[in-house]
């Protein structure tokens, strides 16, 4: 099996910065810079108020048809410069603009109004709400919270897919003698040493068979983020080389006489808890993925996970 999986390749290319002694310092350093607080995306002036929700909707439609990103930011109460510089802002704006031309539906929800856009009725994150004085405006903070929540969900779905791909990549790796030592073994590292095939990933220009993690990435920007220790889709990863007492068979190392032949594992945890993800995931050779919410101490707890050992607080991820 060959996995041409960009996600798995990205987490592996970033792994050189996440293994061993470099991990703790880098985690603490980048956690402070991953995302500013939601308030920093808000404009100094609040979003404009309207006498009726219909007026607010017409203002939204007019702004979108005019193609002015700054005016949309003002209508939603956002800092235009910071909103425009965020990842995917231009593409998202174009998609919303196109969707508004297809269809725009107004739905009542929780005492306010939600704009559903396009044929797929994508809900605009910023709801229309009524103030105590009877005026209507787009709720900036609620919209930013919703965007963050949606991103968490998307990141977690992507991470589960990547973890599944990791299991397949390890089995692929062990199907051949990759390092020429006469032993069929699993990879103890995500990224191979220079000129070697001792990890799940090696660059295609190195020659020989394609690595189990797939070809080198075309998306250089995403690759650089992974290399900088920013993770992939909000998550960091580490190979686990043993299992604990909560697992059938008890405590033992997967590495025997220097070769990882007794199994393999992986842990994936959010770069910034509550912002890029909530759940932490672990998997072993069985392919059954477990998840747990480790709370505000997620980074500290995940740094110490070296063995596959899900306990009572861990649940099996549903298919």
Stretches with model-predicted labels:
Residues 265-319:
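C-terminal soluble interaction/assembly domains
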Residues 67-79, 185:
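Short, well-ordered alpha-helical segments enriched in acidic and aromatic residues
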Residues 11-22:
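Bacterial N-terminal signal peptides
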Residues 77-125, 226, 230-233, 238, ...:
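Surface-exposed, charged secondary-structure patches
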Residues 1-11:
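Bacterial N-terminal signal peptides that target proteins for export
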Residues 113-116, 120-157, 161-164, 288-292:
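Short beta-strand edge/turn micro-motifs at domain boundaries
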Residues 173-275:
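Flexible, glycine-rich surface segments
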Residues 30-62, 143-168, 172:
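Short, low-complexity N-terminal intrinsically disordered segments enriched in polar/charged residues
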């Amino acid at each position: 099996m060959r996995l041409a999986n960009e996600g798995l390749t990205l987490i592996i290319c970033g792994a050189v910065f996440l293994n061993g002694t470099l991990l703790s310092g880098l985690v603490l350093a980048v956690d402070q810079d991953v995302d500013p607080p939601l308030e920093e995306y808000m404009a100094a002036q609040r979003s404009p108020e309207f006498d009726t929700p219909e007026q607010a909707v017409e203002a939204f439609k007019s702004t979108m048809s005019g193609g002015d990103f700054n005016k949309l930011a003002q209508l939603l109460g956002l800092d235009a410069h910071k909103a425009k510089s965020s990842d995917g802002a231009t593409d998202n704006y174009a998609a919303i603009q196109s969707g508004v031309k297809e269809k725009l539906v107004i739905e009542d929800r929780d005492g306010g109004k939600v704009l559903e856009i396009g044929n797929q009725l994508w809900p605009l994150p910023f709801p229309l709400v009524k103030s105590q004085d009877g005026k209507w405006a787009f709720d900036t903070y609620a919209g930013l919270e919703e965007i963050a929540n949606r991103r968490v969900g998307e990141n977690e779905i992507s991470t589960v897919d990547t973890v599944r791909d990791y299991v397949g990549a390890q089995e692929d790796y062990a199907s051949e003698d990759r390092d020429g030592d006469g032993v069929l073994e699993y990879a103890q590292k995500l990224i191979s040493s220079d000129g070697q095939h001792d990890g799940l990933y090696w660059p295609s220009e190195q020659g020989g068979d394609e690595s189990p993690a797939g070809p080198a990435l075309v998306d250089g920007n995403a690759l650089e983020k992974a290399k900088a220790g920013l993770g992939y889709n909000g998550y960091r990863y580490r190979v686990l080389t043993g299992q604990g007492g909560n697992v059938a068979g008890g405590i033992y190392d997967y590495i025997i006489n220097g070769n990882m032949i007794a199994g393999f594992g992986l842990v994936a945890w959010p770069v910034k808890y509550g912002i890029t993800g909530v759940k932490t995931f672990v998997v072993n050779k069985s392919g059954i993925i477990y998840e747990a919410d480790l709370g505000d101490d997620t980074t500290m707890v995940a740094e110490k996970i070296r063995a596959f050992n899900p306990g009572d607080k861990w649940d099996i991820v549903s298919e």
